[in-house]
Amino acid sequence: MAAVSSAASLRGADYENGLRGGAGPSGGGQDPGEDDPMGRGTLDLDLELLGQGRRSRRVGGRTAPGRRSGGRGGSGGGGAGGLEELEDEELEEEEPGELTGDQTIEDPELEAIKARVREMEEEAEKLKELQNEVEKQMNMSPPPGNAGPVIMSIEEKMEADARSIYVGNVDYGATAEELEAHFHGCGSVNRVTILCDKYTGHPKGFAYIEFSDKESVRTSLALDESLFRGRQIKVVPKRTNRPGISTTDRGFPRARYRARASSYSSRSRFYSGYTPRPRGRVYRGRARVTSWYTPY
């Protein structure tokens, strides 16, 4: 509205000046539109100011400094063209600035996402390497354990059994270290084996001790019926399992039978240390077990 009112006032002033400007050769008033440059210039200035007001509203009410003065000082066409170019340049400068600001906001987020993806890929590669190493170790470890019993011949097993003893009535809470310490005075101990139930994992109450020489076996027999963890243990030489005889462990009754068989010399001596009742239980128990497991 200010632009329109200023244009109207300027136009009225210019019109009065044109009328006062005197008469031409014929004595009449001079036409402002023919010779006076203010006539057409005033019209162009009005259009320019109107267009400037519209542009200022379109841009958002912000106009560059010196627009009106440039429009007044220059010609109508030149001033309007200069203002349009100036406005276009300002718009072009503002738009790239806004895009640049958006890019500066998005770039750190993209970089963070890319960095996270790289970290996840590195972790996946490390996990694959660890898994491959574990698989290699698992593939390499079973063969030595499985090859031991296969490589050992019957003669070697018999020789190892000749250096071993059977220890019965062992406390269920006993450990291999405690047994080794109990028989340490008899000689060098190579291995201590405490048998456990394969279903429950609980100890069966007996163990095998392997010495480095046969002399240690004879020395260890002196600990027969000695106290170990409050129990009187039974110490006898270990028997070698012969081919054709079942090696399945049937628990404590079999261990008692093995202990008796090791001291067997005659039929009368076999029955001398035991009452008929336990003997009958052992026999009937073994018979029932055999009948139960006939399908196997």
UniProtKB/Swiss-Prot annotation:
Domain of life, source organism: Eukaryota
One Gene Ontology molecular-function label: RNA binding
Subunit details: Monomer and homooligomer. Binds RNA as a monomer and oligomerizes when bound to poly(A).
Gene3D superfamilies: 3.30.70.330
Entry remark concerning the domains of this protein: The RRM domain is essential for specific adenine bases recognition in the poly(A) tail but not sufficient for poly(A) binding.
PROSITE patterns tied to this protein: RRM
Bias (Acidic residues): 84-97
A Gene Ontology cellular-component term: ribonucleoprotein complex
Record's keyword terms, sorted: Coiled coil, Cytoplasm, mRNA processing, Nucleus, RNA-binding
Coiled-coil ranges from the UniProt annotation: 107-141
Protein name: Polyadenylate-binding protein 2
Gene giving rise to this polypeptide: pabpn1
Biased composition (Gly residues): 19-31, 71-82
Function: Involved in the 3'-end formation of mRNA precursors (pre-mRNA) by the addition of a poly(A) tail of 200-250 nt to the upstream cleavage product. Stimulates poly(A) polymerase (PAPOLA) conferring processivity on the poly(A) tail elongation reaction and also controls the poly(A) tail length. Increases the affinity of poly(A) polymerase for RNA. Binds to poly(A) and to poly(G) with high affinity. May protect the poly(A) tail from degradation.
Region annotation (Necessary for homooligomerization) ranges: 146-296
PANTHER family tied to this protein: EUKARYOTIC TRANSLATION INITIATION FACTOR 4B/4H, POLYADENYLATE-BINDING PROTEIN 2
SUPFAM superfamilies linked to this entry: RNA-binding domain, RBD (SSF54928)
UniProt subcellular location: Nucleus; Cytoplasm
